[in-house]
């Protein structure tokens, strides 16, 4: 639970927090606590993963591209980043959406100009309405909600209870639906229930739009992330902790995903990744809601100090992974007691 974790962290019961802390800057600017993040200014952390809203493609009407795209382009992502993430994420104006995280290495792996017309930054209410109107998905009975083949479009958007940033993001998704005539309500099951449902196909009723994670940084990225988001090998399976929880299938995407590991030519690899981004932004089986760090790395220096931070002089730099993962463990050798 984020709130309980934040309370313990503020009290000095936790030295390094990997939880999302809303308005983290208030801990030092307003509360005067000896707290800091890896980066001193927004977004305070290094973006590495792409928390994603998945469409249940087995749900009524969500097999229609116009419905999926309308919802995705109508969402106010700036509000998600400002409110749900309290600016601890780059915006989609700063880092246009693709399948890549914001790091320079991944951003260099696709042709930005080639997909520019497919990228969207959100809050395009009029564009979303036109998409639906052009597809004949309109409100014919005057109740305020659009219908597809005579049935109102009603969806439940969901995230785990207590995951406050995800819940806030899902509320923004639901609000977008209302603005374009699609009835989206929200529900927040406990994680113990949530994780058993979303990992087993077919999805239960009430999981039409749902949040899950994507891969962060690593030696197999972005290939592994893309595979987990798009590969049909995971579609419509049970006990699925890999990805593609919405049941998306595209043979062209599968072919590219299978071919990439054997590619050695940089130009060929870039072309393949660019084509995958095109497919993803054209079909919209899911959509990224924010950029998120591999780990939130916020430290309380009440007891220990000299934690890793940007420009700390370590060579190679110790990454902000909470002193627990890979080279981040090296940071343990640098911390010292505030009062020895």
Stretches found by the model and what they are:
Residues 6-7, 26-28, 53, 63-64, ...:
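Extracytoplasmic/secreted cell-surface and envelope-processing proteins
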Residues 1-59, 70, 78, 82-85:
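Extracellular/periplasmic solute-recognition and catalytic clefts
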